[in-house]
Amino acid sequence: MFFALAALGLVAMASCEKEAEKTPEAAPELTNETQITGIPFTGGEFTYEFDSNKKWTVAGDAEVTIEGQTYEFGLTPTSGDAGHGVVTVTVPANKGAEEISYSFTLTLLGEDKDTKPLTKTVSLTIPAPSVTDAAGNTYKVVYLKDGNYWMAENLRYVPEGLTPSKDLKNVTAGVYYPIKVSDDHTKAIQTSDENDIKAYGYLYQAETAFGLAINSLKTEEEAKRVEGTQGICPKGWHIPTSKDIINLVGKSVSPFTLNDKAPYYDGKNASIKLLNEDSFNIASWGAISIQDNSKTEATLMGWMKNNPDIISSGYIHGSTFAQKYEFPQGGTQTGIKNIQFLGIMPMAGNGTANGAKLSYKIGASVRCMMDKATKE
């Protein structure tokens, strides 16, 4: 009996010594970690990569709500073994006015209960919507209730080879300086002040807005082909079509049909108030009025004596053909007298922004809309 107990004691001691001699588990280690940067406001799928000596998990909120807008994020896969880890992060498009910050947690797990896990917070930022033109000018962008991204500022890009003009006898300048009320409130004037240009943008004739040379549109067929063109908009954006315009504001002139379900139609008209409540920042900025190809001098449109403190009307270009006029046969001029496209006409007096026809010779504002394929 004595010898048996002694033997058991020796076995127990040996077991304890082995336990004491056991090599501690290596601490969790994270190396070769990449960062998620350069996310566009349109979101997308991005990879977070790392090397780990342990099994790992990732976790983060599937939904984040900001100012009433819910954003859905995705993490795939949510766990993995030691080695090279790759997590695909699905990032939503930013539909608000401010940047969005989001983070998720990576945890490296030890096999031994006494091994402390390694936890790492991974952060990313979705920038506020904006777009930059070919000259480096950056514009605010807004996501509107029609389900599209629109520029919330007027274009102020000068195409190569053109110079903004103040000469009202130059009816083929292509680009004109913006308009404002004179200091004595007695008329509309053009302004080359940099702050005014930033606030109001330049005024463009339609062919320039479409990226074409002045007087290059000669037929109805050519005019119809420019619908939805990028023109002088940034890549991935376009001059709005009649569908874009009517789905936004609802009301338009004949032959275009009313859309009474449009989000900014108030039951009677397109509402500047409703549009600006959603930060579209639309106003009446005036226009360079050139009625048709028979005119040799322009006038400044938008100022009225009965409302002298503001510019009362203006135009925003659209790219859908609306109507054409030809010179009468037998006259001194032949061919196209005028081509009209459907645009938007903001009117400060009654607060409307309905679809309207405008001559392709008029110098008007440009607001670009993001292409659907790019947005999605």
Task: Describe the predicted segments one by one.
Residues 29-32, 45, 51-88:
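Surface-exposed binding patches on compact interaction domains or structured appendages
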Residues 87-91, 98-112:
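A short beta-strand micro-motif common to beta-rich folds, especially ectodomain repeats
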Residues 3-37, 110-132, 316, 368, ...:
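Bacterial Sec-dependent N-terminal signal peptides
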Residues 23-26, 125-376:
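Conserved positions within compact, well-structured domain cores
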Residues 22, 27, 31, 71, ...:
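Beta-strand-enriched, solvent-exposed domains that form extended recognition/catalytic surfaces
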Residues 37-43:
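Short, solvent-exposed loop/linker segments at the N-terminal edge
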Residues 43-47, 84-88, 101, 117-121:
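Intrinsic-disorder/low-complexity, polar/charged segments enriched in Ser/Thr/Lys/Arg/Asp/Glu/Gln
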